[in-house]
Every structure is written in structure tokens, then in C-alpha cells.
Amino acid sequence: MSYKQEIKTIFEFNRRFIREDMTEDERNYWLQRFTMYTIDELTEILEELPFKHWKDYTDTEVDKEAILNEIADVLIFTFGMVDILGYDEEDILNEIAEKNQVNIKRQEEGY
């Protein structure tokens, strides 16, 4: 399955829970929840990394697969937020492409 099809599948799954007829208060409630879920997943990434500056981590290996798994969760919840706001997978992929071009230009100009 292509990545675009997989992203579409995520959006379709989210739509089982995210209704188009939600009130503004309901959208805000779910946007807040999905934001908290995303923050929780980001925190789980931090927990996979050595963080105690006083401890010697020279022999510690990071579980990159566990981190990749948490990043997948971050993206899934992020796509949920996109859906809650009324956008779809094409909207976010276009936004990512546009923002990436802005970021590249900024880096090239010494931003």
C-alpha cells in the first residue's frame, strides 16, 4: 500500500469518531484531546532517550524502533487534528509541501 493510501486509511478510520456535524465546542474538545494525546506520544519519545545529564550513557543504545513507533502515533493523532479542523489528507500533504519549501528557502537565506 502506498503512503498516500495509508494516510487516507488513517483519515477514514478517524472519521468513525470525528463527525462532520460536531459543534464548535465539540471540535474544540476533541482538538484539545488529540493535542494532549500527541503531547503524550512525544513524551514517550523523550522517555526512550537518555536524559540525565549526570549519568554516563556511553554504553546505552537507543531503541530506534520504539521511537519510530511513537512517531507513528504522533502522526496518527496529528492527522486526527487535521480531520477535526475539517481538512483532509490532501490538504495536509499540500500544506507540508508548501511549508517545507518555505523552510528550505529560510535555511538557504540563513534564517
Name each region found by the language model.
Residues M1-Y111:
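Flexible "arm" and connector segments at domain edges
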